[in-house]
Every structure is written in C-alpha cells, then in structure tokens.
Amino acid sequence: MAIEIKAADVMKLRKMTGAGMMDCKKALVESEGDFDRAKEIIKEKGKLVAAKRADRETSEGAVVAKIQDGKAIIVGLGCETDFVAKNADFQALAQAIAEAALVNFPADKEALMACTLADGRTVEAAVTELTGQTGEKHVVAGYEAIEAPFISAYMHVITGKLAAVVGFNKELDAQVAKGVAMQVASMNPVAVSAANVEQSVLDAEFKTAVEKTKAELIQKDINAALTKAGINPAHVDSEDHIESNQSKGWITAEQATQAREIIKTVGEAKAANLNMQMIENIAKGRVQKFLKENTLEEQGYQMGDGKTPVKDIIKAADAEAKVLVFKRVSLSD
C-alpha cells in the first residue's frame, strides 16, 4: 500500500536538503516516508547528475568576497548557465560557502570542501545536492584567502563572476584601497612587484621573448627579399595564403614557387647568422616591459589616468603604506 506523503513532509525535506519540491516528494515516495533514506536518495541523484555532466564547462556562477578581523576569502561557485547562476538557491549556497570559508579559514580548496555549513552539511555535500536539484554541473571553481593588517575587497557587481582582495601593511584611504582592489580585478597582475615574480615565470618570459625576437629578425630579412623580388609578403605569409592567393590570381604559380624558395633559403641563412647577444638584450627589454605591465606596483592605475604607477597612487595617499598580498578569482578567465 502506497504511503501518503504530506505537503508538510515535503517542505520539511526541502528545508533539510535544499532540493526541489518534486525531487523531495519523489524521494519520500521512494523511501516510503523515511527521511534519512530520502536524503540519501537526493544525495545520490546529485552524484549521478554530477558524474554525467563532469565534462561540462562552468563559466557562469557567483564569486563572493568577505572580510573579517584581518582575514579575507574569495569563493567562486561555478555552474553551466546564467539562468541557474541567478537562482536564489544557487546564490544562497555561494554566500553560505563563503561564510563557512571565513569562519574556518581553510588552507586550500580541498579543505574548504570538507568544511561544514551553518545547516550542518559539508560544502561538498551541499554542492552535490544542488547539482541534483538543478540538473547542472556545480563546482567550487576558485578559493583564495589572505591575512593582513588592512584589507580591501572588490566584487564586480554587474557579472558577479569576478572578485579581488588586497592586503596592505596598514590602514589606507578606503577609496584608494578599493581602487587598488579594482586594479587587481581588472588587470590581473602576476605579482605585487618584480621582486615577487617567480623565477620560473621570468625564465619562461625570457625564453618566449628570445624566440619571438629571432622570428621577427628572420621574417624581416625574408620580407625584404620578397619585396625586392616584387612579391607582396602579405600574400605569401603562410602556405594557406600562398595557395589561396594563387587561386585568386593575386600571385602566379611562378611567384608562389619563388616565394617558397626565398622563405626557405633566406630564412635558413638568417637563422644561421643571428646575433644572439643583441637578441638577448632585446629579450631582456621585453621582460622588463612584461614586468611593468604585469606587476601591480608598476601597472598604470586604471581608476586614474591609466599611466601613473599604482605604487605612486598608494604613496600619495600614505608614504608608508604598501601592498603585502592580493588574490583574485574569476569564472571567466
């Protein structure tokens, strides 16, 4: 005999799990009114949905930043669609996870997943249950935490998918501090200053700069030789372009053959006679440019004229103030 499921029981289970009304009713019917079993059914449904949608992109969602007593956290909760991201239950879970992160201050995302929410569920369980409720993949896509004497935060109010927190060595004018947090959010620096950039990053940038400089010098000689031969370099800058432009009648078959020969012979000759000292000097300059554009202190302040370095903006507000640390979470990167 089928057990009668009362509306009050459905509401009770919904309050316990956060699942949808129909999912709660189905779980109670299947469990014959056993609440513990019904909760397990809902949890298993969430795991099943999560497994089926494991390869889905989660570029939508909510990013929440919170500050309290010299500590700050950012949590990014991702989902598949903007529709679900705006759902009240989804937004509430993002806030609840952020609160748990601020209270427990876990060391990393793995530790955050084991934290307990105010309703008694772990973060992992709550995310899985919401996955079952919405039918979309949900994931804690980002988590960052900092400690500092003074902290400012910025959350992008339009998209809700980006936030940054910045820690200073001392209290700073609120408007300036928030502006620096906005700088971090919008410009995504790699470090506070050049001294804080990891050597592996510098090595990779130098290597890239060397290869780019080599390619440019080789291409410069090739272009000069092509132009001297009466061939437009733009018409033969790739094999696809050579074939396409030949079919359009922009270059002849003879010019195509000649261009290929010039590209090969001139390119090989130049590559064998590159001035590596000059190339490395150019590469070093490019690394310095990278540091200026990608370290917070040296970046042009975007909330001002876009040219004045952030460090000068901070110094003008307080000569003793400086940035100690920053973190950023974005669902769109």
State each model region's role.
Residues 2-333:
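N-terminal assembly/interaction segments in proteins that build large macromolecular machines
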